[in-house]
Swiss-Prot record:
Keywords for this protein: Lipid metabolism, NADP, Nucleotide-binding, Oxidoreductase, Secreted, Signal, Steroid metabolism
Catalytic activity field: a 3beta-hydroxysteroid + NADP(+) = a 3-oxosteroid + NADPH + H(+); 17beta-estradiol + NAD(+) = estrone + NADH + H(+); 17beta-estradiol + NADP(+) = estrone + NADPH + H(+)
InterPro entries: NAD(P)-bd_dom_sf, Sc_DH/Rdtase_CS, SDR_fam
SUPFAM superfamilies in the record: NAD(P)-binding Rossmann-fold domains
Protein name from the UniProt record: Dehydrogenase/reductase SDR family member 11
Binding site for NADP(+): 13-18, 38-39, 44, 65-66, 92, 161, 165, 196-199, 203
Binding site for substrate: 146, 161
One Pfam family hit: adh_short
Highest taxon of the lineage: Eukaryota
Species annotation: Gallus gallus
Length: 255
């Protein structure tokens, strides 16, 4: 990780869960991390904790609604002005709405598309352009995906969500191919976890907290820190090694 010391990483959805754990890990390794979310209160608290702990890097909170392209473009413009640009882009932000294919609300589907697919695509484009204009040839774009992007589970409330995650799988491989065509050594990686103990299930089942709690009680889940360790592993790979996809489940998880 030495080559990343002092360089700039963008982590979307950095206020809680996987995003917060990844942001903390990168700061621990000396990176300058821009952590964005719709609300930055928790990121500001995390930044203070990192500073108090004496971590060599810094965490810069940035308020951004990833469903709004103008806000994304404004964020990248600010990063360029204040920090020159992005060297690592970690597209972590994602959400699910309990909207089945046969009866779901269009608004919920559109929200998932906007955040899980469009925001990932826009951030990827802008991160690449930031790297290109500064002749950065060793940058990295990491998409935090899901095992739902590799298999469809028999739960109607996550079928549309699964479709958006299949899109992330395709986008990551398409990105890898386009980067090769562009004759650059910028790398693209997809990290696909199974069940991670975060607040994700409580947001999905916001009207049924008992069901959400049962999701995490059924097996010993992955932790957000496991995902952060996977990100560090990917970034630590030698420049000639392209890690395309990491699929990781809790040992006890079946599907």
């Amino acid at each position: 990780m030495e080559r990343w010391t002092g360089r700039v990483a963008l982590v979307t959805g950095a206020s809680v869960g996987i995003g917060a754990a990844v942001a903390r890990a990168l700061v621990q390794h000396g990176m300058k991390v821009v952590g964005c979310a719709r609300s930055v209160d928790k990121i500001e608290k995390l930044a203070a904790e990192c500073q108090s702990a004496g971590y060599p890097g810094t965490l810069i909170p940035y308020k951004c609604d990833l469903s709004n392209e103008e806000e994304i473009l404004s964020m990248f413009s600010a990063i360029k002005t204040l920090h020159q640009g992005v060297d690592v882009c970690i597209n972590n932000a994602g959400l699910a709405r309990p909207e089945p294919l046969l009866s779901g609300k269009t608004e919920g589907w559109r929200t998932m598309i906007d955040v899980n697919v469009m925001a990932v695509s826009i951030c990827t484009r802008e991160a690449y352009q930031s790297m290109k204009e500064r002749n950065i040839d060793d940058g990295h774009i990491i998409n935090i995906n899901s095992m739902n992007g590799h298999s469809v589970v028999p739960q109607s409330v996550v079928h549309f969500y699964s479709a958006t995650k299949y899109a992330v799988t395709a986008l990551t491989e398409g990105l890898r191919q386009e980067l090769r065509e562009a004759k650059t050594h910028i790398r693209a990686t997809c990290i696909s976890p199974g069940l991670v103990e975060t607040g994700f299930a409580f947001k999905l089942h916001d009207n049924d907290p008992e069901r959400a709690a049962a999701t995490y009680e059924s097996i010993r889940c992955l932790k957000a820190e496991d995902m952060a360790n996977a990100v560090i592993y990917v970034l630590s790979a030698p420049p000639h090694v392209q890690i395309g996809d990491i699929q990781m489940r809790p040992t006890e998880q079946i599907s």
